A protein has these predicted regions:
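Extended substrate-binding grooves/exosites of carbohydrate-active enzymes
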Residues: 1-123, 127, 132-138, 145-151
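Beta-strand-rich binding/interaction modules
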Residues: 125-173, 181-184
Length: 184
C-alpha cells in the first residue's frame, strides 16, 4: 500500500489503476479497507481490479467416494478431469463460487465498497459520508436503531441529501437521546 501512496504523491501526471491488486484465492484478500482508505485519500489512486470474480470449477458427477459418474456432484478443476498439464486449484480463486454463491470475502468487499458510510461523531451525533462521486443521497433512506441487549429501544428513519463525495454532520434526535436515557 505504501508503494501506491508514494506513487500518488510523486507528482505523477496520470492516475493509477491497480490490476489484480487483491487476489481472492481462499480467504487471502485482506487489506481491502486499508487499500480503499488510501484510494479515497489520494486523488491519483483510481481503484483497482480484484482477482478474481468467480471460481472456474465445472460441475462433475461423482459418487460418495469421489469417483466420477456417481450420484452426486462437485465443482472440479485442475487435473480432476485427467487433464495434463493443469493449473491445480489455482482456478478456485474467486469472490464467488462457480454457481455465483458468494464466498465470505465478498461480504468484506461489499462493506468496503458501500456507497455511504455512517460514523459516530462523539456522543452528540454522527457523520454521513457520501462515497459516490456522481450523485447525492436523496434516493437513499436509512434507519437509526437503538438496541439494548438485542432489544429495539428506539428506531427512526434518516433521510438527508449529502452531495457527492461530501459529508454531513447530524446530531442525535431528542427522541433518541430520551430513549437512550430511559434505557440506562
Amino acid at each position: 500500500i505504501s508503494d501506491i501512496v508514494d506513487y500518488a504523491r510523486s507528482g505523477a501526471d496520470r492516475p493509477l489503476v491497480m490490476c489484480e491488486y487483491n487476489h481472492a484465492m481462499g480467504n487471502s484478500n485482506g487489506s481491502l479497507a486499508d487499500y480503499w482508505a488510501a484510494i479515497e485519500r489520494e486523488p491519483l489512486l483510481a481503484g483497482g481490479f480484484v482477482w478474481e470474480w468467480k471460481d472456474h470449477g465445472l460441475r462433475q458427477e461423482v459418487d460418495r467416494k469421489g469417483s466420477v459418474n456417481g450420484s452426486t456432484w462437485r465443482y472440479a478443476y485442475g487435473g480432476q478431469f485427467g487433464d495434463q498439464p493443469n493449473d491445480g486449484n489455482f482456478v478456485a480463486d474467486g469472490l464467488n463460487a462457480s454457481d455465483l454463491a458468494p464466498h465470505p470475502a465478498m461480504r468484506e468487499l461489499a462493506w468496503v465498497h458501500r456507497p455511504v458510510a455512517v460514523v459516530a461523531d462523539g456522543d452528540r451525533g454522527f457523520a454521513i459520508h457520501n462515497r459516490r462521486s456522481h450523485s447525492g443521497t436523496s434516493d437513499l433512506r436509512g434507519t437509526l436503531t437503538l438496541l439494548v441487549v438485542g432489544e429495539v429501544m428506539h428506531e427512526e428513519e434518516i433521510t438527508v441529501d449529502v452531495p457527492p463525495l461530501a459529508s454531513v454532520q447530524r446530531d442525535y434526535s431528542s427522541a433518541l437521546i430520551a430513549a437512550l436515557n430511559n434505557a440506562s
